[in-house]
Amino acid sequence: MFDIHREELDWGGRTLTLETGKMARQADGSVLATYGDTKVLATVVSAREPKPGQDFFPLTVNYQEKTYAAGRIPGGYFKREGRPSEKETLVSRLIDRPIRPLFPEGYKCDTQVVITVLAHDLENDPDVVAMVAASAALTLSGVPFMGPVGAARVGFIDNEYVLNPTVDEVKESALELVVAGTGDAVLMVESEAKELPEEIMLGAVMFGHRHFQPVIEAIIKLAEKAAKEPRNFQPADVSEVESKVREIAEADLRAAYKIKQKQDRYAAVGAAKSKVKKYYEELALDGTKVPTAQVVSDVLKALEAKIVRWNILDDGIRIDGRDVYTVRPIVSEVGILPRAHGSALFTRGETQALVVATLGTGEDEQFIDSLEGTYKEHFLLHYNFPPFSVGETGRMGSPGRREIGHGKLAWRAIHPMLPAKHEFPYTLRVVSEILESNGSSSMATVCGTSLALMDAGVPLRRPVAGIAMGLILEGEKFAVLSDILGDEDHLGDMDFKVAGTEQGVTSLQMDIKIAGITEEIMKVALTQAKDGRVHILGEMAKALTTARAELGEHAPRIEVMKIAVDKIREVIGSGGKVIREIVEKTGAKINIEDDGTIKIASASGDAIKAAINWIKSIASEPEVGQIYEGTVVKVVDFGAFVNFFGSKDGLVHVSQMANERVAKPSDVVKEGDKVKVKLMGFDERGKTRLSMKVVDQTTGEDLEAKAKAERDAARAAAPAATGDEAGAAE
């Protein structure tokens, strides 16, 4: 019934198995990949013909994690998987990026790649396994795919590269890098690092590329046994269209791409394209067969790319007039929003990000439900890209894949520089609003986030900056471009973004569109990126060099205290009654952890102090000799009872109310009065003895201690005085 084919190899100390022919047989291609006990099923279906008028390649990649893969049931009311999680969205992009460039130009058949995690052993992250499975399924499917693609995760532990580190090993690693590519080229890199030098980062890329070659060989062997007949796809011959388009528009396009201002340049480019469109419309009116609008558009794009690329390679001059090294003018401002805890406006050329930082408490942490279990995230970074930022109208609403991906890239850049949670126990939410965009808005977000957090008083280890780089390669000639524009991103051969501090890289993202980019070229690019990053850090320093010494005026203050674990129940109370009362009466937010750590937060210092004292009164015992502020709760003939330590009461005997004789306690105090008392001790029955007369009721000073200090000072002075008098008598 089943025609099963399988390939196995030892990879990173674990067995990788690729199997086809048993599951999802009606898909064009399907592969079950097993690594350890992690199992991932990848399927590919591609339409036989493109839709009429289709003007782009409709590739969709959907990565989905099923909770049954880890033996869990989904949370929520409906108890089933819902909208994609952030991780599912990010992994979908991770798979899409290396496979998309490997489809031939002009292929426009609707193609869907679906990857499903069927089992997760909680040791081997399914994302790399999913990339391998998707590559294998595409290779077997018969669709025109110039793969296969391999992928690997690389760690850096104890100064050694580690292939496919486990989930636990990643936590100890100074680097988490995912690399994908073909047999002779790297296509995609995604990473987070702890200020590593460029040579370590590049070494990790090449290490991963070497070590996924056996995976590519296994996919090829599987394809030799089980691949479907390749589909016949021939790109249309557009040589005549190319010739005519050059004749009509090349001169105008060359002139347009010498205009430095983006909107004016776009207008001139649009006018040149309109001339071509008008020519073919008039031709069609005469009954002449003309190419489709999409063919003409594709030819125009290719001509634009050629003009821009050779202008740079021949003259070293870019679209906006810069040379290949120059970063656009930068303006950094901080503290621009009066009620925000921290804010920054970062402008680089025609790219601008308004970044706002907000500090919260443990209650504000995000609960994340993953296959590995539920955990809390205390650093959130949200990136928004409204259509007005590029002068367009468009959809507004929940974030798309691109916004989630750019936000995560900036998150990775900043995350290694955050203070440890026990040092700075705040939840941090950063929102980046892209107000203008002409390339590198994610890196503007990195720079703005660094400034906004420092403006909020978050003690980053060092400021972080990011820069987007590009590459143009034609034969032996190449040019690396610093701080690329949006047009240079689309027309170049490599787009890579590097973020970090003056000491090293914290995040690297790379997308390479062609083969032939050598290790040496990447080394040049990374070195040039470092120079650009250091320059940007210098420009940012004009606004702020380090975190402010104090938190923002409107930010909450957090104090941390510790109580015995066996006292947690008393502080919380039956059904949370006690803790709710403390919160309601003091106005402070309180978070209690299982180890007895308590975080008290409020914008008011008095509220924090009141909450701390209340909790102390429950979880600890009063100390003899200490002075406390209390409230008179009852006046009797022989004294007054004072509530002085949370729920604890003590007696101030009438003889301890004042130094002079008191006839009636009610002459001195009444119920509700605030008084200062000293704990004198406990009587034989364990009752608390308090005194008011030994405490200055205005200042709270211990009068007994003051008198003792004066007596001690007098005794110390007496011998000296006696000696002086004896000397004078002689």
Swiss-Prot record:
| GO cellular component term, pick one | cytosol
Its localization reads: Cytoplasm
State where composition is biased (Basic and acidic residues): 703-714
Quote the record's binding site residues for Mg(2+): 489, 495
The record's section on Gene3D superfamilies has:
GHMP Kinase, N-terminal domain, K Homology domain, type 1, Nucleic acid-binding proteins
What is the top EC class of this enzyme, as a single word? transferase
Specify where the region named Disordered lies, as residue ranges: 700-730
Q: Where is the composition biased (Low complexity)?
A: 715-730
Q: Has keyword Magnesium? A: yes
Q: Residue limits of the KH domain?
A: 556-615
Q: Which InterPro entries match?
A: ExoRNase_PH_dom1, ExoRNase_PH_dom2, ExoRNase_PH_dom2_sf, KH_dom, KH_dom_type_1, KH_dom_type_1_sf, NA-bd_OB-fold, PNPase
Q: Kindly give the Pfam families that the UniProt entry links to this protein.
A: KH_1, PNPase, RNase_PH, RNase_PH_C, S1
Coiled-coil annotation: which residues? none
MF (Gene Ontology): 3'-5'-RNA exonuclease activity; magnesium ion binding; polyribonucleotide nucleotidyltransferase activity; RNA binding
> Primary place of residence?
cytoplasm
Protein family according to the UniProt entry: Belongs to the polyribonucleotide nucleotidyltransferase family.
Q: What does this protein do?
A: Involved in mRNA degradation. Catalyzes the phosphorolysis of single-stranded polyribonucleotides processively in the 3'- to 5'-direction.
UniProt cross-references to HAMAP family, sorted A to Z: PNPase (MF_01595)
What is this protein's name?
Polyribonucleotide nucleotidyltransferase
Q: What is the lineage of its organism?
A: Bacteria, Pseudomonadati, Pseudomonadota, Alphaproteobacteria, Hyphomicrobiales
